[in-house]
């Protein structure tokens, strides 16, 4: 497809200004960097996993990266283009708490049925533990992915139906900051645990 232009087209820039929290200058800079790392203008899951591994050098980030990739890939075509990338980045880095929680919910809801089952939560938590357990000391009641999943469900599943709705997820996270920490996977926040 030839060499990509390193400047965003005006209509794309307008669209991204309306749909992200980034300035025009920031968008142009991100685009330049994106094309430098992805000359084709798209990222596949393997390329994404390699990039993600740089952020978590002491653990295995590949499974978690697959879940993040799936959530970034909003049109489910198996690739992430710049628009998908920058919109997800905007939500995760600059979005309001509720936007971040909605994004996280969509990542945890593996089958897309509008609920997070214990199995889905456990799969994500296992991926998080593989990625950060070597650099994070967990309290006893969160020492395994299973214990952490149970703790999250005890606090969030208010109607005890064995699954979390978006409302339960957001309400639980907003009412107790420790739940947000339970859901996070940032090793720099290890001291919070």
From Swiss-Prot:
GO terms for biological process: calcium-mediated signaling; cellular response to calcium ion; cellular response to electrical stimulus; cellular response to L-glutamate; inner ear development; positive regulation of protein targeting to membrane; regulation of postsynaptic neurotransmitter receptor internalization; regulation of signal transduction. It holds the Pfam family EF-hand_1. Changing residue 190 to T: In DYT2; no effect on protein localization; no effect on protein abundance; no effect on protein stability; no effect on protein 3D structure; decreased oligomerization; no effect on calcium-binding; no effect on affinity for calcium; increased interaction with voltage-dependent calcium channels. It is found in: Cytoplasm, Cytosol; Membrane. Brain specific. It is a peripheral membrane protein. Myristoylation facilitates association with membranes. Ca(2+) 1 binds at residues 73, 75, 77, 79, 84. One of its GO terms (molecular function) is identical protein binding. Keywords: Calcium, Cytoplasm, Disease variant, Dystonia, Lipoprotein, Membrane, Metal-binding, Myristate, Repeat. Its main location: cytoplasm. InterPro entries: EF-hand-dom_pair (IPR011992), EF_Hand_1_Ca_BS (IPR018247), EF_hand_dom (IPR002048), Recoverin (IPR028846). Residues 24-59, 60-95, 96-131, 144-179 form the EF-hand domain. A lipid is attached at residue 2 (N-myristoyl glycine). One of its GO terms (cellular component) is cytosol. It is linked to Dystonia 2, torsion, autosomal recessive: A form of torsion dystonia, a disease defined by the presence of sustained involuntary muscle contractions, often leading to abnormal postures. 'Torsion' refers to the twisting nature of body movements, often affecting the trunk. DYT2 is a slowly progressive form that first affects distal limbs and later involves the neck, orofacial, and craniocervical regions. Belongs to the recoverin family. Binds 3 calcium via EF-hand domains. The cryptic EF-hand 1 does not bind calcium. Calcium-binding protein that may play a role in the regulation of voltage-dependent calcium channels. May also play a role in cyclic-nucleotide-mediated signaling through the regulation of adenylate and guanylate cyclases. This is Neuron-specific calcium-binding protein hippocalcin.
């Amino acid at each position: 497809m030839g060499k990509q232009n390193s400047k965003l087209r005006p209509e794309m820039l307008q669209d991204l200004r309306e749909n992200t929290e980034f300035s025009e200058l920031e968008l142009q800079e991100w685009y330049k960097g994106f094309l430098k790392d992805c000359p084709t203008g798209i990222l596949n899951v393997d390329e994404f996993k390699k990039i993600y591994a740089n952020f978590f050098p002491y653990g295995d980030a590949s499974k978690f990266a697959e879940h993040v990739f799936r959530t970034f890939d909003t049109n489910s075509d198996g690739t992430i283009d710049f628009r998908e990338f920058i919109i997800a980045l905007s939500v995760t880095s600059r979005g309001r708490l509720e936007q971040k929680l909605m994004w996280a919910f969509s990542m945890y809801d593996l089958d897309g049925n509008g609920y997070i089952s214990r199995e889905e939560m456990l799969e994500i938590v296992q991926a998080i533990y593989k990625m950060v357990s070597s650099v994070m000391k967990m309290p006893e009641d969160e020492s395994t992915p299973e214990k952490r999943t149970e703790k999250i469900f005890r606090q969030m599943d208010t109607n005890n139906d064995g699954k979390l709705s978006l409302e339960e997820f957001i309400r639980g996270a907003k009412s107790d900051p420790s739940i947000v920490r339970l859901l996070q996977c940032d090793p720099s926040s290890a001291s919070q645990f």
